[in-house]
Amino acid sequence: MNPTGSYKDRIAAATIEDALRRGLRGWIGTSSGNGGASMSAYGAKAGLPGFLCIAADAPPEKVRSIVPYGATLLPMSQLGIAEMDAIRELASEFRLKLSVTAYRYNPEGMSGSEAIGSELINQGEFTHVYVPAGGGGLLVAVARGLGGASTARLICTQPEGCDPIVRFLNREIVEPQIVSCTSTISGLQLPAPPDGKLAASAVRETDGWGCSVSDADAWLMQDYLASKEGIFVEPASALAAAALANDVKSGRLAATARPVVILTGSGLKDMRRFRSTDLLTQRMFTIADLRPRLEAIDASEPPARR
């Protein structure tokens, strides 16, 4: 179980454990939302004060979920490599644990997510693992967790409007870094991913590939997973599933393949798409309004068992 609704609880648990072991005074970090919620929760449990530099455009749901834990929130208009390096210096100066979900800054914490790979091995045979990538750290963690126990190919999935690792894998750019992002997918908007090269190396070592997916395809997959599978995930998670669907349609993925998709966070983390769908502000219904709707169901074929 991930108490705050994303896999980053694993990273936070390992990060706080390292902070306590080293006798640090608290923690400081950056986040687009999920990592901040995780660190704030685990930091509160450990009694360690936290200072979170959060992206100013983070989804309100993510920000609100952090507030109850009591960490100090510092909204920032920009959180690039320069800002992260500066925060690392402050962490060292004030004896705080640096909490950034990247091996480049927090290898001890990132090790907490490597168990995802080893847990996959216990689930049975699989041939491909589709992983959403922002900074690239999760993909690296999955690769390290799999180790030599699996021959599965790793597939790096990113939004078309922010896909430096995919473009680097495709040899379109010489560094996994671009000037800016146009994607609106929260958590995947990193033009200069700190673990970009590590992630690309992990993909190449498994003979995998990169997939760029439109924001629109990610949203469609989010709706599909919720309405057909009963799984409500945030757009960043749905993007990886959309990449799989696109590879199936194009024939890139063989019919005999047994793919796995890493779904990283709950859909309750980012509800921006659904704010205009406020059913409580529409007209009220009566019991009499139910009959025509129920009759429509009665006339349809029952769903086949899956």
What role is predicted for each listed range?
Residues 1-306:
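PLP-dependent amino-acid enzyme catalytic core
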